[in-house]
From Swiss-Prot:
Taxonomic source organism: Sarcophaga bullata
Subcellular location: Secreted
Residues where Phenylalanine amide is found: 9
Disulfide bonds: none
Presence of keyword Secreted: yes
Organism superkingdom: Eukaryota
Similarity comment: Belongs to the FARP (FMRFamide related peptide) family.
Protein name in UniProt: FMRFamide-9
A biological process from GO: neuropeptide signaling pathway
Entry GO terms, CC: extracellular region
Length: 9
């Protein structure tokens, strides 16, 4: 989900 992508940053 987009939440996971945010954490990757």
């Amino acid at each position: 989900g987009h939440a996971d992508n945010f954490m990757r940053f």
